[in-house]
UniProtKB/Swiss-Prot annotation:
UniProt entry keywords in alphabetical sequence: Antiviral defense, DNA-binding, Endonuclease, Hydrolase, Magnesium, Manganese, Metal-binding, Nuclease
Enzyme Commission code: 3.1.-.-
Assigned protein family: Belongs to the CRISPR-associated endonuclease Cas1 family.
Protein name: CRISPR-associated endonuclease Cas1 3
The UniProt record lists the keyword Aminoacyl-tRNA synthetase: no
Molecular functions per Gene Ontology: DNA binding; endonuclease activity; metal ion binding
Names of required cofactors: Mg(2+); Mn(2+)
Organism of origin: Rhodospirillum rubrum (strain ATCC 11170 / ATH 1.1.1 / DSM 467 / LMG 4362 / NCIMB 8255 / S1)
Gene of this entry: cas1-3
């Protein structure tokens, strides 16, 4: 199955730049007539003596200027010519394994900015400046987590566990704002995340339970959804950073690790709960995703992944979710940004900070007052 903008068909000309997801096993992305086409080969039913035993079916054809990224999931491939077409049109290509984990990214030559990266390196090597930004990231993450839990409380019967989780997560946010070292900040973040997920656990009331956050690999359907969503959102942030010439691997809160986009993960922290967790909760509680949409992950023993049909459902919901505005304190409804534009704004804020402008301001989710 192919999803473009989550619809299974190319977006209309008036739509913004989008992502093409290729999920049907055996699909091949080709370059034909200046367009990216997706084909799948299947065995023909009762072929005649002169017929080919293989049937080819075209699933989609998209003009490259309408795309910003291409995501291949599981057993799907891309030809060398199609890859060249993507690079020529500045389309980032991401390869995800069957469980939704990121295997590789292929990106066009970067628009590197030497002065911008020098500023980034200088901040990274300045522990006090790095701590200031790491504190802002973690504080925003925990405040947004508490706001998500308050939203849950307003939409369903509260419980002692949920009320306690809100209080403890808010307390962790205040502690993060006052952290005096990177080590203490890491401990505060871990404790706050534990309290938050204990509260989120009470909100899954559909056919898919959530027993607590677990990963590497995700052992159950709810964790599989969260992990998949985090990969998709982090991948999008990585692409935006690369497009601005920022080094996505040099973060402030997340340490350096080979191949890890630490800066993208920093930006992800303030967004993962308002964006990914709320979507996973909604589609589970509305039973749009059900237990039959998951299967054991053969690539990661003990893990669980979405089936092909499950991925289709999730990606359709995902793209729709990214087009919805998010609440911000003090921002009127008509001025709220959808997730696409919000991500770009946050990257713009970061770039301004790196160039010596206003210190980075993380996204704040929710209303001005708790409750």
């Amino acid at each position: 199955m192919v999803g473009s903008g989550g619809t299974g068909a190319p977006p209309p000309r008036s739509s913004p730049m989008t992502t093409l997801y290729v999920t049907q096993p055996g699909s091949v992305v080709r370059s034909e007539g200046g367009s990216l086409t997706v084909w799948v080969e299947t065995e023909a039913d009762d072929p005649g003596p002169n017929d080919s035993p293989v049937r080819r079916k075209r699933l989609a054809s998209v003009e490259p200027h309408r795309l910003e990224s291409l995501v291949l999931l599981g057993f799907t491939t891309i030809t060398a010519n199609a890859m060249r077409l993507c690079m020529a049109n500045k389309i980032a290509v991401s390869l995800l394994d069957g469980g939704g984990g990121l295997a590789a990214r292929v990106v066009p030559p970067e628009a590197r900015s030497a002065d911008l990266r020098l500023h980034q390196y200088a901040l990274h090597l300045d522990p006090p400046e790095r701590l200031i930004r790491a504190r802002a990231v973690v504080t925003a993450k925990l405040r947004n987590a508490a706001a998500v839990l308050r939203g849950i409380r307003s939409n369903q019967a509260s419980s002692a566990a949920l009320a306690s989780a809100i209080t403890q997560t808010e307390a962790s946010a205040e502690a993060a704002a006052a952290a005096v070292s990177a080590e203490s900040l890491l401990g505060i973040e871990g404790n706050g995340a534990h309290q938050y997920f204990a509260g989120l656990r009470t909100a899954f009331v559909g056919g898919i339970p959530f027993l607590g956050r677990a990963q590497r690999p995700p052992p159950d359907p709810a964790n599989s959804l969260l992990s998949f969503g985090y990969v998709l959102l982090g991948n999008r942030l990585t692409g935006l950073l690369e497009a601005r010439g920022v080094d996505p691997c040099l973060g402030f809160f997340h340490d350096l690790r080979p191949g890890r986009p630490s800066l993208a993960l920093d930006l992800l922290e303030e967004l993962r709960h308002p964006v990914v967790d709320r979507l996973a909760l909604r589609i589970c509680n509305l039973r749009k995703i059900q237990p039959q949409h998951f299967e054991p992950d053969a690539e990661r023993p003990g893990g669980v992944k979405l089936t092909v049909d499950g991925r289709k459902i999730f990606l359709e919901e995902w793209e729709g979710h990214l087009a919805r505005p998010l609440r911000e304190p003090g921002v009127a409804a008509e001025h709220r940004l959808d997730v696409h534009r919000l991500l770009q704004r946050q990257v713009d804020r970061l770039v301004s900070d790196l160039r010596g402008g206003e210190p980075y301001r993380p996204f704040r989710f929710g209303t001005s007052r708790p409750g």
